[in-house]
Curated annotation (Swiss-Prot):
Induction: Transcription is up-regulated by 6 hours after nitrogen stepdown and continues to rise for at least 24 hours. The keyword Cytoplasm does not apply. GO terms for biological process: heterocyst development. Disruption phenotype: Single deletion, no change in heterocyst differentiation, in a double hetP-asl1930 deletion no heterocysts appear before 48 hours, by 120 hours only 3% heterocysts form. A triple asl1930-alr2902-alr3234 deletion makes 50% more heterocysts than wild-type (although they are not active for N(2) fixation), while a quadruple hetP-asl1930-alr2902-alr3234 deletion has delayed development but makes wild-type levels of N(2)-fixing heterocysts by 72 hours. The keyword Cytoplasm does not apply. In bacterial two-hybrid assays interacts robustly with Alr3234 and weakly with itself, HetP, Alr2902 and HetR. This is HetP-like commitment protein Asl1930. It comes from Nostoc sp. (strain PCC 7120 / SAG 25.82 / UTEX 2576). It comes from the Bacteria. The N-terminus (residues 1-68) complements a hetP deletion for heterocyst formation but only partially restores nitrogenase activity; it does not bypass the requirement for heterocyst differentiation master regulator hetR. Keywords: Heterocyst. In Nostoc filaments, approximately every 10th vegetative cell terminally differentiates into a heterocyst specialized for nitrogen fixation under nitrogen deficiency.
Length: 93
Protein backbone atom coordinates (compact mmCIF):
# COMPACT_ATOMS: atom_id res chain seq x y z
CA UNK A 1 0.00 0.00 0.00
CA UNK A 2 1.46 3.33 -0.98
CA UNK A 3 1.41 6.50 1.10
CA UNK A 4 -1.03 8.16 -1.33
CA UNK A 5 -3.65 5.45 -1.04
CA UNK A 6 -3.25 5.38 2.74
CA UNK A 7 -3.96 9.10 2.99
CA UNK A 8 -7.00 8.71 0.75
CA UNK A 9 -8.59 6.18 3.13
CA UNK A 10 -7.96 8.02 6.39
CA UNK A 11 -10.99 8.93 8.46
CA UNK A 12 -12.05 12.55 8.48
CA UNK A 13 -10.92 14.59 11.44
CA UNK A 14 -14.27 16.09 12.36
CA UNK A 15 -16.27 16.60 15.52
CA UNK A 16 -19.94 15.69 15.50
CA UNK A 17 -22.04 17.83 17.83
CA UNK A 18 -24.75 16.37 20.08
CA UNK A 19 -27.49 18.09 18.07
CA UNK A 20 -26.14 16.58 14.86
CA UNK A 21 -26.07 13.08 16.36
CA UNK A 22 -29.61 13.53 17.65
CA UNK A 23 -30.85 14.51 14.17
CA UNK A 24 -29.10 11.50 12.60
CA UNK A 25 -30.41 9.07 15.23
CA UNK A 26 -33.92 10.51 14.97
CA UNK A 27 -33.90 9.98 11.20
CA UNK A 28 -32.78 6.37 11.71
CA UNK A 29 -35.39 5.73 14.42
CA UNK A 30 -38.26 6.79 12.13
CA UNK A 31 -36.90 4.74 9.22
CA UNK A 32 -35.52 7.59 7.09
CA UNK A 33 -32.23 5.88 6.33
CA UNK A 34 -31.47 7.85 3.17
CA UNK A 35 -31.99 11.11 5.04
CA UNK A 36 -29.71 9.86 7.84
CA UNK A 37 -27.02 9.22 5.21
CA UNK A 38 -27.40 12.77 3.88
CA UNK A 39 -27.12 14.19 7.41
CA UNK A 40 -24.05 12.05 8.13
CA UNK A 41 -22.34 13.13 4.91
CA UNK A 42 -23.04 16.81 5.62
CA UNK A 43 -21.83 16.44 9.20
CA UNK A 44 -18.60 14.78 8.07
CA UNK A 45 -18.01 17.59 5.57
CA UNK A 46 -18.70 15.63 2.39
CA UNK A 47 -20.90 16.70 -0.50
CA UNK A 48 -23.82 14.22 -0.68
CA UNK A 49 -24.13 14.80 -4.44
CA UNK A 50 -20.90 12.83 -4.82
CA UNK A 51 -22.63 9.73 -3.42
CA UNK A 52 -26.37 10.25 -4.04
CA UNK A 53 -28.13 10.90 -7.37
CA UNK A 54 -29.17 14.54 -7.81
CA UNK A 55 -32.91 13.85 -8.10
CA UNK A 56 -32.90 11.67 -4.99
CA UNK A 57 -30.98 14.31 -3.05
CA UNK A 58 -33.40 17.09 -4.07
CA UNK A 59 -36.38 14.90 -3.13
CA UNK A 60 -34.85 14.22 0.29
CA UNK A 61 -34.27 17.95 0.84
CA UNK A 62 -37.88 18.75 -0.07
CA UNK A 63 -39.32 16.07 2.23
CA UNK A 64 -37.09 16.76 5.26
CA UNK A 65 -35.68 19.73 7.09
CA UNK A 66 -31.98 20.19 7.72
CA UNK A 67 -31.16 21.00 11.38
CA UNK A 68 -29.69 24.48 11.89
CA UNK A 69 -26.42 23.12 13.32
CA UNK A 70 -25.77 21.09 10.17
CA UNK A 71 -26.79 24.03 7.94
CA UNK A 72 -24.28 26.27 9.71
CA UNK A 73 -21.47 23.73 9.48
CA UNK A 74 -22.26 23.02 5.83
CA UNK A 75 -22.12 26.70 4.93
CA UNK A 76 -18.71 26.97 6.57
CA UNK A 77 -17.40 24.14 4.41
CA UNK A 78 -15.99 25.49 1.14
CA UNK A 79 -17.02 22.54 -1.03
CA UNK A 80 -20.69 22.81 -0.07
CA UNK A 81 -21.42 26.29 -1.41
CA UNK A 82 -23.21 24.95 -4.50
CA UNK A 83 -25.52 22.87 -2.30
CA UNK A 84 -26.29 25.91 -0.13
CA UNK A 85 -27.31 27.88 -3.22
CA UNK A 86 -29.65 25.06 -4.28
CA UNK A 87 -31.25 24.97 -0.80
CA UNK A 88 -31.80 28.75 -0.84
CA UNK A 89 -33.48 28.51 -4.25
CA UNK A 90 -35.78 25.75 -2.99
CA UNK A 91 -36.74 27.81 0.09
CA UNK A 92 -37.78 30.69 -2.18
CA UNK A 93 -40.21 28.44 -4.07
Amino acid sequence: MTQESFQHHQLCNCTILTEEWEAILQAISVGKYSWACVLMLHTAGYNPLTYIPYRTYIRLLKNNSMPDTIKTRKLQHIGAKFVAIKIKMMELD
